[in-house]
Amino acid sequence: MNAHEIKKLFPVLDQEVNGSPLVYLDSAATSQKPIAVIEALDDYYRRYNSNVHRGVHTLGTLATDGYEGAREKIRRFIHASSTEEIIFTRGTTTAINLVAASYGRANLGEGDEIVITPMEHHSNIIPWQQVAKATGATLTYLPLQKDGTIKIEDVEKTISEKTKIVAIMHVSNVLGTINPVKEIAEIAHRHGAIMLVDGAQSAPHMKIDVQELGCDFFAFSGHKMAGPTGIGVLYGKKAHLEKMEPVEFGGEMIDFVGLYDSTWKELPWKFEGGTPIIAGAIGLGAAIDFLEDIGLDEIEKHEHELAQYALDRLSELEGMTVYGPQKRAGLVTFNIEDVHPHDVATVLDADGIAVRAGHHCAQPLMKWLDVTATARASFYLYNTKEDIDALAKGLEKTKEYFGHVF
């Protein structure tokens, strides 16, 4: 793949910020959108904007075909066995909350355990905290190695017959750690537990086969994978979803409504109450077409090369601390000695370089790292080695500036 040519397909990247060419290194927060996705959204709103499912008119049929067609694209993209297993949500957060509120509250009780890790995004911690309080279950944390990885031996020791749910991110949004979720799922199932995978940072960057991974649930967002904001996906095994109750009620998800009772539609629609995110789903479908045309294997390889190049370039700079393992996904999180991450990001932004600074919705991990915040550069298919060179130059400038200040 040619990242320089791919970059030309993303209009927002063709601009100057503060007098310098934009270098966008914040795709772990949200990705930019290619022309193909922008045009798909524009086409929907210009040509066949309508509500879905019940309309017999032409626009309604076109909108329904686009919406349900996107569901099939997603099924194929993650290798689910049926579109009944693909639930549209507002994002990863909503998807995890759905599982916690529906499956969790129905299947957890006093003495049961939920196993997660200290590296989780808040969206995969807080829902389990809440359901644990409501049910009397206990949150148990897998220990991390010094480099922020999980040791399978520790998984074997931690998961027990008390464990009912294991919920782990596939890829850390801070460390870039790629967790062995397939092996963890096998251990969870051996003890009768189910496995949820937070795929927000993996689905955009690598091939996903939920059946190969063996997970019971898999959640991800459209906006991190070249799609629109406000659209996400929950994959769930049909056997689980059929037993789960909806957590949002209203139009679209009902089969029959009486004065005192109601019944629900079949899967997947019983979990999609209200007017659905039609444009978002169509845009996500276009994003999947775009990514598949390039090839997820090629994207993963490209990002791996960028991550290793970034590690090499940052290792040349004195006073830098880089967090996470050597083998990682396409991001680097770091601090400069005696310089606050927000100051780092501000100086970089003055030269048109966009990075993220803060706790990255991972405060327990920041405590584990013994820092309050970090700076993060994250890469996607449109980034190049020249972008990383610009980052390294900007970090050197930052060091020099604050060296003079202090």
Swiss-Prot record:
SUPFAM superfamilies documented for this protein: PLP-dependent transferases (SSF53383)
Keyword Transferase: yes
Enzyme class of the recorded protein, top EC level: transferase
Pfam families noted in UniProt: Aminotran_5 (PF00266)
Modification type N6-(pyridoxal phosphate)lysine: residues: K224
NCBIfam families with a match to the protein in the record: sufS
Protein name: Probable cysteine desulfurase
Phylogenetic lineage: Bacteria, Bacillati, Bacillota, Bacilli, Bacillales
Gene giving rise to this polypeptide: csd
